[in-house]
Amino acid sequence: MIVFSLALLVTLAPMISTTGFAARPHFIETPHIVKNPDLSITVNYHAKELGKKTANVTLSSHTSALIGCVNPGGQLSPSKGEQTEEIQSQSVKIKPKDGRIEGSLTLEPPVFPSVLDICPNKNWNTNVLSLSYENVVIEVKQKNSEILKFNIGNVSQ
């Protein structure tokens, strides 16, 4: 009986539909983050098993920067500096090829205040004392439904 069942399974296996066993969408590897010299960040991603529907990929974060003033002698002002914050988001639409998408998205740093806005005079310079991208998330949607989401976390520049 076991031999007959095994023979039947081997014979019928090629006829069984594989659609019930389709893989779920996933990132092929963990999205990779790059800290760029211009203080922006870039996230590289590669996902598969997305089917044929156009994917909308979004990278978002909350950015926070502390800006200080530097006098003509190169000394940092003893003031606490100026805090600046922004919500950042970058999106792209991609048509999957063989169910796969890959690419990169970049988030720019927040708009920093000008020298005249925070320093005693125009002869001073501004300096970024700290910059962080908080809750960096990459999300893939198809037909307005979330398919994939990866929380990268916080990134300091």
Please place each PLM-identified region on the residue numbering.
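C-terminal segment of classical bacterial N-terminal signal peptides
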Residues: V10-T19
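Bacterial N-terminal signal peptides that target proteins for export
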Residues: M1-L6
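Mature extracytoplasmic or otherwise solvent-exposed domains
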Residues: A22-Q157
